[in-house]
UniProtKB/Swiss-Prot annotation:
NCBIfam families: lepA, small_GTP
Binding of GTP, residues: 23-28, 140-143
Ranges for domain tr-type G: 11-193
Family of this protein: Belongs to the TRAFAC class translation factor GTPase superfamily. Classic translation factor GTPase family. LepA subfamily.
Pfam family, one: GTP_EFTU_D2
InterPro entries associated with the record: EF-4, EFG_III/V, EFG_V-like, EFTu-like_2, G_TR_CS, LepA_C_sf, LepA_CTD, LepA_IV
Function: Required for accurate and efficient protein synthesis under certain stress conditions. May act as a fidelity factor of the translation reaction, by catalyzing a one-codon backward translocation of tRNAs on improperly translocated ribosomes. Back-translocation proceeds from a post-translocation (POST) complex to a pre-translocation (PRE) complex, thus giving elongation factor G a second chance to translocate the tRNAs correctly. Binds to ribosomes in a GTP-dependent manner.
Record keyword GTP-binding present: yes
Single GO MF annotation: GTP binding
GO annotation terms (biological process): positive regulation of translation
Compartments reported by the entry: Cell membrane
Name this polypeptide is given: Elongation factor 4
Species this chain originates from: Exiguobacterium sp. (strain ATCC BAA-1283 / AT1b)
Reaction(s) the record says it catalyses: GTP + H2O = GDP + phosphate + H(+)
Length: 607
């Protein structure tokens, strides 16, 4: 194409993404847009076309971002190229959202006409504003009997401060208002700014592993252009590759010869190792490289750590491969090998949050067929020792001994909960129970409140979200962000079975709750660990002090069965002999800990 054609084509490109809270109808709206632009025939349409993973369809949530190229003929008779980048809405996947937004110029903000603005909506809007995107508000689900479009309009104006007077009322399910949205995209979203004659700069916003083509990168061209056969260079790692294939998704993948400014597509260059393609890196040409990198994404730091161990020890290498492949498309997953006396060899993995952790586990079990044992999730603590050294502890078993610890700091988050005002009491009680500090409370309208607390992250990671949902009948929504580390009175609690510490059951707890937690866990383990031929003491200890104990009674054979009414000394002889045997057994016996026991350490708050 000559320069003029390229410039005209560039003016016709619109890159946008859809942002919304979970369940506000983002994926359904994406389906309707695909249908309206004729990307898919009615026969090929299925619910949530862009959610390709089985897990996404089952849970009805979007996990991975997706990019699609659509052709749309607008009312002015011109044909436009729209790139729709679908994003997840759940708090754990904010980094997926921030990656999508970096590749766009506009965003459609979907708000549920019945529920109004939720915590996640706000968080995503702020992300979009940080990226200077044009935001188009859309009020979805107007066909619901409880929909109140005017109230939601007012809310968008009051809470976010966007002008919502021309927000499009739509129903993605019934297909109402889709055309107006497309017209608004063409009108309001600016075309990509970029210079086709400059050296190539392309932003990698996602990558995945394909068994045949190696690593495939999803890219957005910012300046210049790239053709099949070009030698390209990754700017972060400095490695060079030859482009073997370029493609666009219309949801069906189609190969193209070149990608130009503003295009969103995929690039494969027979890249074999996962580490060579970093999400957020810039691709440029090896011959005439760009001078600077594009402002990429910030590196996402894991918030939650837990150990993953294969139940079958022989599958250790398979687990490593599985994690490497998942890490490809999931920039936020981190892992390193670790060993545990109780569980053998495995990995310490870092995740963004509990949903992220659950999904990775489920994907490993499904896609790679590996059965896992998981240990209790923990966060990173900063421990200052008496000698003045600061250690970062992501695993309770790495905690130094009590007498060597001077102080421990734990991460705190600022949690914003949006809720109907009937549940304010229940939420405040829950946050107080989780060691939260009350910061602020705002009424959004007459029925809804935003409550802000500062809470230790370790209290949120396990079941805070579930408890929040159950204490508000599912109406509350949560968003949280890290605010830094603070000193806390924390201790490490060890669990001893048969007087030996089981490293995988250790956890870190606030000193005030140590006694209660110890008691609950000891009772739980007593119920879960199968009885042995000898009695097993179960103890919870803080340092050298035992704070709770329970005993799993021994199974015993009835040795007196064949003594009919016999002599007491005969019975005593048999019982003494049995007692001797049990004593010997206890010295050499080892205790098997079932998987449920590890999980029970997690779910102790439910009692």
């Amino acid at each position: 194409m000559n320069k003029q054609e390229l410039e005209n084509r560039q003016k016709k490109i619109r890159n946008f993404s859809i942002i919304a809270h979970i369940d506000h109808g983002k994926s359904t709206l994406a389906d309707r847009i695909l249908e309206k632009t004729g990307a898919l025939t009615a026969r090929e349409m299925k619910e949530q076309t862009l959610d390709a993973m089985d897990l996404e369809r089952e849970r009805g949530i979007t996990i991975k971002l997706n990019a699609v190229k659509l052709n749309y003929t607008a009312k002015d008779g011109e044909e436009y190229i729209l790139h729709l980048i679908d994003t997840p809405g759940h708090v754990d996947f904010t980094y997926e959202v921030s990656r999508s937004l970096a590749a766009c110029e506009g965003a459609i903000l979907v708000v549920d006409a019945a529920q109004g603005i939720e915590a996640q909506t706000l968080a995503n809007v702020y992300l979009a504003l940080d990226n200077d995107l044009e935001i188009i508000p859309v009020i979805n689900k107007i066909d619901l009997p409880s929909a109140d479009v005017e109230r939601v309009r007012q809310e968008i104006e009051d809470v976010i401060g966007l002008d919502a007077s021309d927000a499009v009322p739509t129903s993605a399910k019934a297909g109402i208002g889709i055309e107006e949205i497309l017209e608004q995209i063409v009108e309001l979203v600016p075309p990509p700014t970029g210079d086709p004659s400059e050296p190539l700069q392309a932003l990698i916003f996602d990558s995945y592993y394909d068994a045949y083509r190696g690593v495939v990168a999803s890219i957005r061209i910012v300046n210049g252009s790239v053709k099949v056969g070009d030698k390209v260079q990754m700017m972060a790692t400095g490695k060079t590759f030859e482009v073997t294939d370029l493609g666009v998704s219309t949801p069906k993948p189609i190969s193209v010869k070149e990608l130009n400014v503003g295009d969103v597509g995929t690039l494969s260059a027979s890249i074999k190792t996962v580490g060579d393609v970093r999400v957020g890196d810039t691709i440029t040409l090896a011959k005439n490289p760009a001078t600077s990198q594009l402002p990429g994404y910030r590196k996402m730091n894991p918030m939650v750590y837990c150990g993953l161990y294969p139940i079958d020890a022989a599958k250790y290498n398979d687990l490593r491969e599985a994690l490497e492949k998942l890490q490809l498309s999931d920039a936020a997953l981190e892992f390193e090998p670790e060993t545990s006396q109780a569980l053998g060899f495995g990995f310490r993995c870092g995740f963004l949050g509990m949903l992220h952790m659950e999904i990775i586990q489920e994907r490993i079990e499904r896609e790679f067929n590996i059965d896992l044992i998981t240990t209790a999730p923990s966060v990173i603590y900063h421990v200052t020792t008496t000698s003045g050294e600061v250690i970062h502890v992501d695993n309770p078993s790495k905690m130094p001994e009590q007498q060597k610890v001077d102080s421990i700091e734990e991460p705190y988050v600022k949690a914003a909960v949006m809720t109907p005002n009937d549940y304010v009491g229940a939420i405040m009680e829950l946050c107080q129970k989780k060691r939260g500090t009350f910061i602020d409370m705002q009424y959004i309208d007459t029925t809804r409140v935003k409550i802000t607390y500062e809470i230790p992250l370790s209290e949120i990671v396990y079941d805070f979200f579930d408890q929040l949902k159950s204490s508000t009948k599912g109406y509350a929504s949560l968003d949280y962000e890290l605010i830094g580390y603070r000193q806390s009175r924390l201790v490490k609690m060890d669990i001893l079975l048969n007087n030996e510490v089981v490293d995988a059951l250790s956890f870190i707890v606030h000193r005030d709750f140590a006694y209660e937690r110890g008691k609950v866990i000891v009772e739980k383990l007593k119920a879960l660990i199968p009885r042995m031929q000898f009695e097993v003491p179960v103890q919870a200890a803080v340092g050298t002090k035992i704070v709770a104990r329970s005993t799993i009674k021994a199974l015993r054979k009835n040795v007196l069965a064949k003594c009919y009414g016999g002599d007491i000394s005969r019975k005593r002889k048999l019982l003494e002999k049995q007692k001797e045997g049990k004593k010997r057994m206890k010295m050499v016996g080892s205790v098997e800990v079932p998987q449920e026991a590890f999980m029970s350490v997690l779910s102790m708050d439910e009692e």
